[in-house]
Amino acid sequence: MRIILLGAPGAGKGTQAQFMMDKYGIPQISTGDMLRAAAKAGTELGLKAKELMDAGQLVSDELIIDLVKERISAEDCAKGFLLDGFPRTIPQADAMKTAGVAVDFVLEFDVPDEEIVKRMAGRRVHAGSGRTYHIVYNPPKVADKDDVTGDDLSIRPDDEESTVRKRLDIYHTQTEPLVAYYKNEAGQGNGEYHKFDGTKTVDVISAELATVLG
């Protein structure tokens, strides 16, 4: 069961990835984690990647594809894997296909931009403990104060509205074209493409996923 997850930041991919990992016993592969692990393991590819990252340079698509191939040949990927955050662009998707990395399911989580802004801009965090709140979905007992300590809550820079909108713009420009790409692939019999309404409750989406994936 080889799965690619698509969806804007804040669309709920992480929550559903956890559900699929637990249910199907497959690992989630995020390129960031993979690059760090390969660099730490000191493999030839990992050392190449580390050299580039240490110099503040982008790791090439070719090198990432090689790392993906190396990672998915590991024992824990025998039943399959979840790719999150890769591919991000059409050239990366093409390179993956050329490298012979087949995919069974592409799952898109669709949430309108304004809902994502509301989700992320409403998050509040207690710096000392990492406790998180949401002004709409999980508000603190006293506005902007931590329930336990009474300390002020803060907004993470990543959750600032301007940052969220920038990330959404990048997603729409770079990654959204993959939706059409993978729909086309599915039309040619290369895997299945499924779109989920990310505004539904977590349990409903999980149940829909289980129906699709079996």
Swiss-Prot record:
Residues engaged in binding AMP: T31, R36, Q57, L58, V59, G85, F86, P87, R88, Q92, R156, R167
Catalytic activity field: AMP + ATP = 2 ADP
PROSITE patterns given in the database record: ADENYLATE_KINASE
Localization (cell): Cytoplasm
Source superkingdom: Bacteria
Matches recorded under Pfam families: ADK, ADK_lid
GO biological process, one term: AMP salvage
Pathway: Purine metabolism; AMP biosynthesis via salvage pathway; AMP from ADP: step 1/1
Residues that, per the record, bind ATP: G10, A11, G12, K13, G14, T15, R123, T132, Y133, K200
EC number: 2.7.4.3
Gene Ontology MF term list: adenylate kinase activity; ATP binding
Enzyme class, broadest EC rank: transferase
Keyword set, alphabetical order: ATP-binding, Cytoplasm, Kinase, Nucleotide biosynthesis, Nucleotide-binding, Transferase
Entry GO terms, CC: cytoplasm
Chain positions covered by the region annotation LID: 122-159
Annotated segments matching region NMP: 30-59
SUPFAM superfamilies in UniProt: P-loop containing nucleoside triphosphate hydrolases
Keyword Kinase: yes
Listed CDD domains: ADK (cd01428)
Family under the similarity heading: Belongs to the adenylate kinase family.
Function description: Catalyzes the reversible transfer of the terminal phosphate group between ATP and AMP. Plays an important role in cellular energy homeostasis and in adenine nucleotide metabolism.
Oligomer status and interactors: Monomer.
Entry text on domains: Consists of three domains, a large central CORE domain and two small peripheral domains, NMPbind and LID, which undergo movements during catalysis. The LID domain closes over the site of phosphoryl transfer upon ATP binding. Assembling and dissambling the active center during each catalytic cycle provides an effective means to prevent ATP hydrolysis.
Designated name of the protein: Adenylate kinase
Protein source organism: Psychromonas ingrahamii (strain DSM 17664 / CCUG 51855 / 37)
Lineage, uppermost ranks: Bacteria, Pseudomonadati, Pseudomonadota, Gammaproteobacteria, Alteromonadales
